[in-house]
Amino acid sequence: MTRKIKNVLLVLLCMIFVQGSLPLQAEIKPEADSPTAGIQKFFHALQLIRQHYVDQEKVTYKSLFELALRGLLKELDPYSVYESEEVFNKTKEETRGEKVGIGVFVILRLGSLEVLATDPESPAEKAGLKPGDMIRIIDGEPVNGKKLEEAARLLQGNVGESVTIQLYRPSTDKHMDLTIERQKLRIRSVTGAKILDRASGTGYLRITQFSQHTAEDLDKALADLIKQDLQLLIIDLRGNPGGLVSTAVQACSRFLPPEKTVVSLIGRKEKILKCFVSEKCKINLQDLPLVLLVNGSTASAAEIMTACLRDYKRAVIIGEQTFGKGVVQNLIPFGKKEAIRLTTAHYYSPSRQIIQGKGITPDIVITLTPARRFALAGQLNHHPGEIQPQLRNAVRDVQLERAIEVLKAVKLFRDTHNFEQQTK
């Protein structure tokens, strides 16, 4: 038994001994939320498991304490989770924009991992995995009953190793198995930057997620578009599962004056834990007309950007209702090399609107059929910013088409207004 576990057990035994001696003194009523009785009960259950469980190798103190910790967090909410040393290291790799896996973004829904998006040219995309697919079994382990982080980690591993997944595809009502080889992935967070219409100066870019490099990637894309006489901009957040709040704040800062509230983190008893404000940046396009494209796979940090620019009337939102993930997880170091990912707050928009469980309703709702949504999600990876690529079975991007129309109308209104002002 390790020294750490011995110390824990010693404390537990001391607490039990002290409580057992209380009847010899004056009666003391325990606090309503006192840990003493619970610790006694837990320790008793621990001993019973150790004495009677059939597979003795499974009930070491180390494994039991880890299982207890996982179970405790699992019952709180879908996002709180314990991260072992291995998992914690992978988390740090992901926030740097690098990871080993198959290149897929997932969310937990109905006991399965629902695919929100796949990285362009990733192993997942090459194997035929599509947005909307429901992953039910990973290397023989059912997803049902697992937390999001726990299930998603099963898709990761070492470079060159394969993972076998069993999935259900709602769009075709089919079940299938896929075996995919893991690779080292470099996450490209800003793609497809281009001028769509030179006459109006309508530009386009897609933010696939908010990673450590997003602000840098965004600045490069914007600088290139500005050189091409950018007058109007469409930012595509469809299929963006979120990421780092700090980089979403940086992205908003490019389109707002400095010191504007972007998002507030509200904790227990409505206490404001932190208020993120827009920053002063080299590239600032606070007067540039914007459209944001969103859908049901736009989540978390992407919803922060959407809600912020909507509240300040800086952008017209077009598409479908967003996902509705508006809770904050803090990664708290636990021990020397482990961590607990714990929900500590809710996101609130600048106008104090809550995102969690509600999502954001676009200003212009354009609902797609499941089949069209499914086809378009895959198409965006290779042909972002194209209304209808010259491909067999290509679908027309009616949401993008509407965005272009809206921005042209905005430009016409501005040009007319400016002309009237000049002639007065």
Go through each PLM region and give its residues.
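Bacterial N-terminal signal peptides that target proteins for export
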Residues: 1-10
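Linear, non-domain "peripheral" regions
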Residues: 3, 20, 179-183
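Bacterial N-terminal signal peptides
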Residues: 10-20
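Sec/Tat signal peptide C-region and signal peptidase I cleavage site
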Residues: 22-26
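Cleft-lining beta-strand/loop regions that shape enzyme active-site pockets
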Residues: 27-38, 42-62, 114-118, 122-131, ...
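Extended, small/polar residue-biased N-terminal targeting/export presequences
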Residues: 50-114, 162-164, 168-192, 401-407, ...
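Short acidic, Pro/Gly- and aromatic-enriched capping/linker segments at domain boundaries
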Residues: 334-345
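Conserved functional hotspot residues or short segments at active or partner-binding sites
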Residues: 346-424
